[in-house]
Each structure stands twice: as structure tokens, then as C-alpha cells.
Amino acid sequence: MNLEKLSKPELLTLFSILEGELEARDLVIEALKAQHRDTFIEERYGKYNISDPLMALQRDFETLKEKNDSEKQPVCTNPLSVLKAVMKQCKNMQERMLSQLAAAESRHRKVILDLEEERQRHAQDTAEGDDVTYMLEKERERLTQQLEFEKSQVKKFEKEQKKLSSQLEEERTRHKQLSSMLVLECRKATSKAAEEGQKAGELSLKLDKEKSRASKLEEELAAERKRGLQTEAQVEKQLSEFDIEREQLRAKLNREENRTRALKEEVESLKKLVKDLEAAQQHRSTSEQGREPVTMSRGTATEPPMRVSAFCQTESVQTERSHGSVITKLTDTGLPGPTTAAYSYAKANGHCDPEIQTTRELTSDSSTENQGPPREKSAVAAQEKPVENGGCPVGTETPVTMPSHLPSSGSSLSPSSTASSSLTSSPCSSPVLTKRLLGSAASSPGYQSSYQVGINQRFHAARHKFQSQADQDQQASGLQSPPSRDLSPTLLDNSAAKQLARNTVTQVLSRFTNQGPIKPVSPNSSPFGTDYRNLASTASPRGDTSHSPTPGKVSSPLSPLSPGIKSPTIPRAERGNPPPIPPKKPGLTPSQSATTPVTKTHSQASSLAATEDLASSCSPSAVVANGKDVEILLPTSS
């Protein structure tokens, strides 16, 4: 038994043996203790029967008496205890022998059973051995027959081999002849190959020379291609900038026309109001003729003009019109209303109500006729409503000065100077166009018309240049969203420079337009995206008139409820990372102008007329988006 590698049953047997040894040791210890106890008791109390209690009491009495008498008798051995020990030992030996006999009987039975099993196995093995010998005899007979058959086959194969060997000898002689012929042909082919190799070397030298020439030509072609791409990108960028500037100018002009139209309507309404006031004043004067006249002093004060920024892409009017209150005050007192009520006009998101300003002027004129008490005009009244995102013109005769802490002041309040003021205050207008437009205002309208003709020619040339490709894209798109249009008829490798220029234009446009969700548009789209002529004609007006001086404005293409402007760029999914936003031009920031009264002159009127001619090639669209007035410029086809 290997003690280092023990199996589970071996370990169990060892543990059982150890357990038996421990139990035997405990039994021996108990037996030894019992033997010593019995000997001690027998030696001391051997003459008494321990099972009888009376005898035990007598024994104890005698021991006590002996102690008292101090007389000790010698202890003698008792033969009864010895006999009991011998009997006990015999009983133990008998039990042990009986257990050994039972174990021997069980072992004998097991051996008998094993012998019987071995006898049966031997009988089976002998029977199987007879069967195996019979099968082996049959197999031997079969193999002998097969051996005879194979011998006959070997004889046949030997005969065939002799025939084949003779044939192989003949074939070998033929192959020798053929090999000699092939050697001769190979020598000839090697000589020809050497000649062809020399020719190939010469041709390779020529090919290398041609490749060097071709590489030089390719480098020159690549340089020319890069130059062409750069020039094309610059031209496209300039064209896009010119288009953007023209659209912005057209939007400003459209905004100013709407404002002048609103002012005219309000002037008519205020004329009616003045007539009513004059009638009320005449009635009051006739009633006061019988009274004693009172001399009243009249004080007037001049106010510097208000100069605010005239451009904001998103503008809304938040004005509380109090015509009824003004009329009641004027009819009750015979005097104009307080300056605070007349001057408190709202200015929010770059648009203010011109009706309140005109009402203020007319009520001031009526107060001078009625010899009312002097009232000083406070500059604080102009600060009652905050100015947000730039300013807009609100008055035509008496401009009011805005506080110096307002965001921007770059245009006068006269509508005759709206073109130049919108140019100077626009954050995206070109300084070159600004100088030209201001110069035309000082010189003559003919220069402005020639500039407009140049812009229109450039715009239509760029448009007709890409019309064919836009028509193909239109046929492919159908009623779905228009795909990305390549605005340059060049190869596909020019897409990098074109994409850079278009992304720059897109970044500029994204500053000044509200991007709405792009919806599928009609198939009759223009080369620059959606055909906005249909949108401008079919868009329904927004009913919110409290934010705009003209209630008839159409829905904005930039609003969330209408399709967005399709800029000449590729889709956002194909665009990749957007390019960095280019820095603003130094001439785009609005400049602070002097707060001096500006009157309407002939040169400014001519510049306004020229600006109207300039924007004649684009369709305006004044929109209302999210409660804010937005006026955008839409390209039209000529």
C-alpha cells in the first residue's frame, strides 16, 4: 500500500481501523480502572455482601468502631473476588471466541460463493473457446482459398508486366529521340530569349524616360488643378458673399417699405383723430368764449434725435396702443396727454411701433394751438421701454434721442436714410457695398442703377451656369427632400475646396437665420434650393398683429411650420465636421454715430430709390416666426 497516494476506500478503512483502536484503548483503560477498584473493595470490604444495605451499615459501624478503638485488623485476600475475576475473564474469552467463529463462518461462505462463480466462469470460457476454435478453422479454410486465388492473379500480373516492360522500352527510345530534339529547340529559344531581353532592356529605358516625363506632366497638372480649385473656390465664395449681401439689402429695403406703408396708414388714422380733436377744440372754444381770457405761457423744448440700430434678423413689436385713453384725456382737458404716455413706445427685438410716435407729434401740435399750460418734455419718457437687439426708425419729423447706454445706434430716424443706416448697422453687410451705397446717396441714382445691373448680371450668370445640373437633381428628387447639389461643373476631386467654401457660406447664413426643420418641398425647386416664389404666394398670414405693424405678412420659411431655406450646401450627414467660423470683417461692426438731427435730403431719397431698383430681382418675404417679425430675402428666376 502506497501511503503517499491513498484512494478514498483505503482512507476510509484506515480511519475505521484507527477508530477501532481508540475504542479498544478506552475499553482497556476502563477495564484496568474497574479491576483496581474491585481489588481495592475486595481487599477492604471482602467479608461483607455489598448488595445488602444492612450489611453495609454494619460494615460502616464496625469500621467506625475500629477507628474509635484504634484497633486495626490486617486485611486478608478474599478468594471470592478472585473467582469472580476469573469468571469474568472466561466470559470475555467466550464472547470473543464466538465472534471469531461467526467471522470465520462468514468468510467460509464467501469463499464457497467465489469458488462457485469461478466454476461457472470456467464453464462459460470453455464453451466460448470451442466456438472460437470453430470460427478460426473456418477462417483458415477461407484464407487458404484466397491464397490460391491470389497466386493465380500474381501469375497473370507477371505476364502483363512483361508485356508492359517491352512497351516501356520502346517508349524510352522514342523519348530519347524527342528529348534530343527538344534540347536543340531549347537552345534556339534561349538564343532568341537573349535577343528579346536586350530589346526589352532598351524598351524599359525608353519606358523610364516616358514615365519621368509623365510624372512631371502629372505634377504640373496637379499644380494647375490645385490652382483651378483655389480660384474656383474663391470665385464661389465671392459670389455667395455677393448674393448674401444683396439678399440682406433687399430684406432691409423690404422692411423699410413695410414700415413706411404702416406709417402712412397710421398717419391717415391720426389725421382723422386730429380732425376729431379739432372739432372738439372748436366746440370747447365756442363754449369758453364768454369766459375771461387768461394769458398762458407756452414752453417748448427740442429733443436730440434717437439713433438706434436699424437691423435685426428677428424682431417683434411689443407696444401697448392707447388711442382711446389719449382721446379721452384730450377731450376732457383740452390739452395733449402727458408726455410719458405719448412717448412710451415699446422697442423689442429691433422693431418699434411708429404709430405712437406719430400720435405724439400730432398731439404736441394740437397743444400749441390751444394755448395749453407749458409742459416740459422729459428725456426719461424715452427710456420707459427697453431696446433689445438694435433699433429701428419710428418717427418721420421729430426724432427722439435714446439713452447713451443702449446697445447700438447707427441709423437716424428718417426713412429717407434707411438704406445707408441699415448698411452701417448690419452685422453681415460688406464695407465695399456700404461705401458704394453711401456714395451713390451723395452723388446720383445713376451710379446705384449701374451697380444693381452688375449684381444682377453676376447673379444670373451664376444661376444659368448651374441650371442644367439643378434640373437633373430636380428630376431625381421628385417629391422627396432635395438632395445635395454640386454648384460647380467640375470633377469629383474638387469637392474638398467646394465643400470648404460652401461650409463657410453656411456658417455665415446660420448666424442670421433661424434654422427650422427641413420638410420635403415641391419639385419645382430653384438651383439654390426651394423655389420661394410659391412659398411667398401660398403662405398664409399669421393672425398675431400685436407684434407687427402690418398684419398682412406671410408665414416664414424659417418658422417651424414651413420648409426651411435650402442653402447651396451638401447635406449635414455628408458634410462631416463643420469648418471653423471665419472671423468677422472689420467693417461689419456697427459704428457709433453722432446724435444730431438728420433731415430728409434729395440725395438720401435718390439712394432709397436706387436701393429699390437694386432689390428688384429678388422676391421679399416678410414673415412672422414664433411671435417675432422676420424678413428674409428669397431668390427668384428672371
UniProtKB/Swiss-Prot annotation:
Q: Does the keyword Lipid biosynthesis apply?
A: no
GO CC entries:
cytoplasm; FAR/SIN/STRIPAK complex; lamellipodium; stress fiber
Give the UniProt keywords, A-Z.
Cell projection, Coiled coil, Cytoplasm, Cytoskeleton, Phosphoprotein
**Biological process, per Gene Ontology:** negative regulation of transmembrane transport
Q: What GO annotations for molecular function exist for this entry?
A: protein phosphatase 2A binding
Q: Where is this chain compositionally biased, Low complexity type?
A: 401-430, 467-477
Query: Which parts of the sequence carry Phosphoserine?
Result: S285, S481, S488, S522, S526, S559, S562, S567, S591
Q: Which residues carry this modification: Phosphothreonine?
A: T569, T589
Bias-annotated ranges (Polar residues):
360-371, 514-528, 589-620
Q: Does the keyword Coiled coil apply?
A: yes
Q: In which tissues is it expressed?
A: Predominantly expressed in skin, also detectable in spleen and lung (at protein level). Very low levels, if any, in brain (at protein level).
The signal peptide stretch is none
State the superkingdom: Eukaryota
From the UniProt entry, list the residue stretches annotated as the region Disordered. 280-303, 360-430, 463-490, 514-621
Q: Where in the cell is it found?
A: Cell projection, Lamellipodium; Cytoplasm, Cytoskeleton, Stress fiber
Question: Which stretches are annotated as coiled coil?
Answer: 87-284
Quaternary structure per UniProt? Interacts with CTTN/cortactin; this interaction may redistribute CTTN to stress fibers. May form homomers. Associates with the core of STRIPAK complexes composed of PP2A catalytic and scaffolding subunits, the striatins (PP2A regulatory subunits), the striatin-associated proteins MOB4, STRIP1 and STRIP2, PDCD10 and members of the STE20 kinases, such as STK24 and STK26.
Q: Mind telling me which PANTHER family this protein's record contains? A: CTTNBP2 N-TERMINAL-LIKE PROTEIN, FILAMIN/GPBP-INTERACTING PROTEIN
Describe the function of this protein: Regulates lamellipodial actin dynamics in a CTTN-dependent manner. Associates with core striatin-interacting phosphatase and kinase (STRIPAK) complex to form CTTNBP2NL-STRIPAK complexes. STRIPAK complexes have critical roles in protein (de)phosphorylation and are regulators of multiple signaling pathways including Hippo, MAPK, nuclear receptor and cytoskeleton remodeling. Different types of STRIPAK complexes are involved in a variety of biological processes such as cell growth, differentiation, apoptosis, metabolism and immune regulation.
Protein name in UniProt: CTTNBP2 N-terminal-like protein
